[in-house]
Structures are given as C-alpha cells and as structure tokens.
Design a protein with these regions (language model features):
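Short, flexible loop segments at the rims of nucleotide/cofactor-binding pockets, characterized by
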Residues: 87-95, 182-191, 263-266
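Active-site-proximal helix-loop elements at catalytic-domain edges
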Residues: 75-88, 162-185
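SIR2/sirtuin-family catalytic core signature
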Residues: 2-7, 12-13, 18, 22-45, ...
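Active-site periphery "cap/insert" segments of enzyme catalytic domains
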Residues: 4-7, 63-153, 217
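Amphipathic coiled-coil/heptad-repeat helices and related helical stalk/stem segments
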Residues: 95-98, 192-196, 220
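Active-site glycine-rich loop that binds ribose-phosphate moieties when present
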Residues: 140-143, 177-196
C-alpha cells in the first residue's frame, strides 16, 4: 500500500485475505449462513499450510469469483473497491501527513511547478482528494486515450484506478487493472503498453522521487534498468528504511540475537552499502530514513529548498 497505508488503507495481504473470506462466505463455507469467523479460520489455516504468493492468491480469487463476462468483471471490480475502502482504519485521516506533504510538493511556487507528474501504483484516489482540497488542477490518467492538458498535473495510475466515488470519473471501464498474476504478465509482455511507456518516459526524461515503493516489482526494475543505460550517474531517488541494530537484534518475533552489537553494526553497514550499490545500478540514489514519520519532514525540507 505504501503511501496509502499512511491513510489507514489495508496492505496487500490484508486486502487479499479479506476478499478471499468474502468469496468463501458467499459460497457458505462457514456453514448455512456463511459465518465469516469460521471462514476466516479456514483462510488463516490455508495461508499457514499452503500460502501462495500474493499474485497467485489474487489470481485464485479472480478465478473463484468467475470473472468472465463484463457483468462479472464489474462485480469483481466492485468487490475489490468495497473491500479496499471498507477496511480503512478510520483512526488515520484520509489526508495523512505524508499525503499532505506530497500534495504540498505539487503546489506551484513563484518560479513555476516543481512536479511534472505523479505516477502511482496504488488503486485509491487519496492523492486526488488532497490535490482537489488545494484547488490544484490535475487529471487522473488510467488508460491510453486520456491526455492531460498543459495546465493539468497528470496523476498516472499505471496499475489501475479504483476511486471510491466512481461517478466522478468516466471511462473507468477502459482501465487496465493490474491486480493478479496475469495482469502483470500482460504488461510485462507488451513493451508498448501505455503504462510502460509513461513510466519509461518519466525515468528517461525526469528525475523521479520514489515514495513508499519497495522496488521489488520486476517490471519496474526492468524499466529502470533500461532507462539507466542512457545516464552516467543516478538521477532518481528512493526512500528506503534503514535497519537499526536495535530492531535487527530484536527481530519480528522479539527474540533477541545472541550476537555482539559490534558484529551486527558491521553487518548492517555492509548490508546498507550493498543495497545502495544495487540501487545505483538502476539509476537510483537511496534516501535513508528510520521511522515512517521521517518522510513527511524530509519532503517538507525538499519543498522549502
């Protein structure tokens, strides 16, 4: 979810598990009334003993919902949209501090616009809402025939667009939704797919600041590598979280490592240096942060110059 998780939207695994629970509940796997608690237990056990990759799980869900006809396809899109927004943790504001700092960065200054475009891999419309609240003229682009004017800041949804209020947008039926494995395969195979061209053009012609991206997407890495062949020095920047020795020693399970702090520090120094070199090969320089709350502060400093 990246940036969107700061506004309380579910991460990918939570969204997929919820869709799977919803699908099985409709088929009465939890008993005659489709008890969601029982279904959740079934799903949890499935993930435990035979957990597929997230892309395979998404394909499994799409197949389970029998998406074939246009009506079924729309039902599938509606199901994803409903789960995406209904699972939002309401204790977080829709315009989080991070989203707000991104919108501020897009606000033109006396010398002109600092941001040429936004490329998002998320389905939601939270960036658009933040731009709208600031009366910033923009255009959501989610299919190849949409062309923003010179006055509009383009917001490219290269993996698809699922706004909460679909009535505000037209031609959403022409949107390519990269949700499951076959969607990735389609874009990977088609070098001239509009989303590939938009990304490649941005990587070649602009300096990109990557926020909330793990940079593990094979297609994204492929496009960055292609673009990097025409530059001598990295011109893009990506936020990456630096591991501290304290967190590394504690681990996710909370069981501390019985290794000296000096050894861990030396390993992490090499680990971070290696990651920096790997990113340099893709034309990307790393901006390290330790806590997620650091990112808005850094963005505000960039805006202030």
């Amino acid at each position: 979810a990246g940036v969107s998780s700061s506004a309380g939207l579910p991460d990918w695994n939570t969204l997929l598990n919820s869709l799977l629970v919803s699908m099985l509940s409709q088929e009465n796997f939890g008993g005659p009334h489709g008890d969601p608690v029982k279904v959740s237990e079934i799903v949890a056990r499935l993930m435990e003993v035979d957990g597929p990759s997230t892309l395979m799980l998404a394909r499994y869900i799409r197949k389970g919902l029998a998406v074939g006809s246009p009506v079924e396809q729309q039902g599938f899109v509606d199901a994803i949209t409903h789960q995406l927004y209904s699972l939002r943790d309401k204790k977080f504001p829709v315009e989080s501090e991070l989203i707000s700092s991104i919108a501020k960065l897009c606000t033109p200054t006396r010398t002109g616009a600092n941001v040429k475009s936004i490329l998002t891999y998320n389905f939601d419309d939270f960036i658009e809402r933040a731009l709208l609240s600031r009366s910033l003229v923009h255009k959501s682009v989610f299919e190849e025939f949409e062309t923003p004017s010179a006055e509009e800041l383009p917001v490219y949804h290269v993996h698809g667009f699922l706004p909460e209020d679909r009535q505000r947008y037209s031609n959403l039926d022409r949107c390519t939704l990269v949700f499951s494995e076959e969607g990735y395969h389609q874009i990977y195979r088609d070098a001239y797919h509009w989303s590939n061209l938009v990304q490649l053009n941005s990587f070649k012609e602009s300096s990109c600041l990557m926020i909330g991206l793990s940079l593990t997407d094979p297609n994204l890495r492929r496009l960055l590598e292609i673009a990097s062949k025409s530059i001598e020095e990295p011109k893009h920047f990506a936020f990456m979280r630096r591991l501290t020795s304290k967190k590394f020693m504690a681990g996710a399970s909370g069981k501390p490592l019985k290794i000296s702090n000096a050894v861990v520090e030396r390993f992490l120094e090499r680990h971070h240096a290696t990651n920096e070199e790997l990113m340099r090969e893709l034309g990307v320089s790393v901006i390290w942060y330790e806590e997620y709350g650091d990112i808005p502060e850094i963005l505000n400093k960039i805006r202030a110059g």
